[in-house]
Design a protein with these regions (language model features):
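Sec-dependent bacterial lipoprotein signal peptides
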Residues: 1-24
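Short loop/turn and low-complexity linker motifs enriched in small/turn-promoting residues
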Residues: 22-185
């Protein structure tokens, strides 16, 4: 009986430790809009060139990109609020306070990499880049994993024959991990 009690206690401790790292993301209460540097009035930063029939990337809508800041704690990373952040890309920029959601344009196969910089008193300034990924292709290839080797081979063949020019592209979450400033500033 003591062995079962011991086992139950350790399983509870282990389960609590595992679930402790699964904190829900902090709530975001507003959406930040971009500032175009191309003269565009809307989300499509290539719109002024598009009106003149210039060759520009195909506009494919927009996405709310999450910008989140974390600090290294003794047991892992902990999300924090209040960092001053900026986002820059080809044709646009935005400033926000973390956590935030920023509405950014999407261009089929040609979305710009995002440069996200965050700073907060007591932490070192940090910049990361966030590259867009082909979400259509990723979903297609992931579906083959469930079918084993045969499924993966079939999906790889389908992917090779597919017209990927109309695929949807997305950005992942911009996760900026800030390190404590050793100088204490």
């Amino acid at each position: 009986m003591d062995c079962l009690r011991w086992l139950a206690t350790w399983l509870a401790i282990l389960g609590g430790a595992c679930l402790g790292g699964c904190a829900a993301p902090l709530a975001v209460n507003s959406v930040t809009d971009i500032r175009s540097s191309t003269g565009s009035r809307g989300i499509d930063v290539y719109e002024p060139k598009r009106r003149t029939d210039a060759s520009v990337p195909e506009f494919a809508g927009d996405q709310l990109v999450e910008v989140r800041t974390f600090q290294n704690a003794g047991q892992g990373e902990v999300e924090m609020t209040g960092a001053a952040c900026s986002l820059e890309a080809t044709g646009f920029s935005a400033t926000m306070t973390s956590p935030a959601k920023v509405r950014v344009p999407l261009y089929r196969g040609q979305s710009s990499t995002l440069a996200v910089t965050c700073q907060k008193p007591g932490y070192q300034k940090r910049m990361i880049t966030v590259a867009p990924f082909d979400s259509t292709r990723q979903a297609r290839l992931a579906s083959g994993v469930n079918g084993g080797i045969v499924g993966a081979v079939i999906v790889a063949g389908i992917d090779a024959a597919a017209d990927n020019t109309k695929n949807d592209w997305r950005y992942p979450v911009a996760k900026v991990v800030l390190e404590a400033d050793p100088s204490g500033r």
